[in-house]
Amino acid sequence: MRVFDFDGTIYDGESLFDLYLYSARHDPKVFRYIAPVLRYAVKYKLGRATLEQMEYGVGKMTEGYLAELSRSKRVASVEQLVDDFWDRNYSRIKPWYQPESDDVILTASFGLTVGEACRRLGVRNLVASEVDVGTMKVTYLNFSTNKAKRFRELYGPDAVVDEFYTDSKFDQPMIDMARHAFMVKGNTITQVK
């Protein structure tokens, strides 16, 4: 099986950040959630935030953001906003990525957002951060070591990862698990294992 990180790997950018910007065009009130989430994201990328800090900080900010959107009179629904976002941004899926039936997308982004991209790609296997759409509460953040842990919970301890693709050294637990691993920068793919 092939396993892919999503943001920066097969998607050119950070989809959650891009969705924030897209949604702010529809309801500028959500701008107040962008700076705190960016701060946590930068700390995480630099290795300066613990998983617990990410879970608390990003979880709380995301809950506020999603609740604000779901109450907004300018947005039909969060699901419709996500669908419209992918109508506009689906072309940012990198051209080298050709989906296969058993591919797994393993991402820190939310299933609520990346799930629509996976549906359009024909990818059925998504391991992502989770939100209860009824309450808009974050129920699971798929960051850092949680990625490998969650992958093993869902696919079992004996699941064989033939190839793993990422843009981040923070995915080292998945790199270690894979038979072959690749680092992606732009459209350049370099085998690292």
PLM region spans:
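Short, functional N-terminal and low-complexity linear motifs
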Residues: 2-9, 24-25, 60-65, 81-85, ...
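Short, mixed-charge, low-aromatic patches
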Residues: 12-16, 35-38, 47-54, 69-74, ...
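A structural signal for alpha-helix termini and helix-coil/disorder junctions
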Residues: 25-26, 44, 48, 64, ...
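Short, compositionally biased "basic patch" segments
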Residues: 40-68, 118-121, 125-126
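A general boundary/transition motif marking the beginning of the first structured unit of a protein
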Residues: 7, 46-49, 66-70, 85, ...
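Metal-dependent phosphoesterase signature
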Residues: 54-92
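Active-site neighborhood of HAD-like aspartate-dependent phosphohydrolases
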Residues: 1-49
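C-terminal cap/substrate-recognition subdomain and adjoining C-terminal extension
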Residues: 80-193
